[in-house]
Design a protein with these regions (language model features):
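Residues that form generic nucleotide/phosphate-binding pockets
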Residues: 24, 28, 74, 138
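Short, solvent-exposed loop/turn and secondary-structure capping segments
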Residues: 14-21, 65-69, 116
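Short acidic (Asp/Glu) and glycine-rich catalytic loops that position anionic groups and cofactors
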Residues: 19-22, 50-53, 83, 143-145
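Conserved Class I SAM-dependent methyltransferase catalytic core
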Residues: 11, 30-89, 104-105
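Mobile active-site "lid"/loop adjacent to the S-adenosyl-L-methionine
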Residues: 12-33
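N-terminal Rossmann-like NAD(P) cofactor-binding module of classical short-chain dehydrogenase/reductase
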Residues: 6
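Polynucleotide-recognition surfaces of large bacterial nucleic-acid defense/processing enzymes
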Residues: 1-3, 79-85, 90-145
């Protein structure tokens, strides 16, 4: 087990999984079986020691889709969101256009219901540099909440 787990996991929806991987996902990670990146969220939380941190950048879909409701419940009821930057599309100039919408976050492997995390909504930025500038400005102005 690890004090810190950091990942930018691969994305693979159920349609891209072969039969063996799909069956394993349904059995091992029923709350996140819809995409490989979501299984990585759960696995990384399992790999972190109590009080350890999990830092990831993933697709944003787990925050909104009903298929990830149980995953969200696990995160909110068993862990703590320390910080989150909702990046949306165009977070990486090397990935052109609106190919993937992302979120970057740090979770603590401990439940602290009264903890107030730092949250940034950067979806309106149109480039990697613009999102970075928005983030630096928000933090400097104390708006990361």
């Amino acid at each position: 087990r690890y004090a810190v787990v950091v990942a930018n996991p691969p994305y693979m929806g159920g349609k891209g999984m072969n039969g063996r991987l799909s069956a394993w996902a349904k059995e091992t990670y029923p709350n996140s079986k819809s995409d490989l990146f979501a299984m990585f969220i759960e696995r990384n939380l399992d790999l972190a020691v109590k009080g350890g941190a999990v830092a990831m950048i993933t697709m944003q879909s787990w925050m909104f889709l009903s298929s990830y409701e149980a995953l969200r419940s696990r995160i909110l009821n068993q862990h703590t969101i320390l910080s989150m930057a909702h990046l949306g599309a165009r977070a990486f100039d090397s990935i052109g256009g609106e190919v993937v919408s992302t979120t970057a976050f740090v979770l603590e492997n401990d439940h602290k219901p009264d903890y107030r995390g730092a949250y940034l909504r950067l979806v309106d930025g149109n480039s990697e540099a613009e999102k970075m500038e928005m983030m630096v400005k928000a933090i400097a102005q104390g708006r990361a909440a």
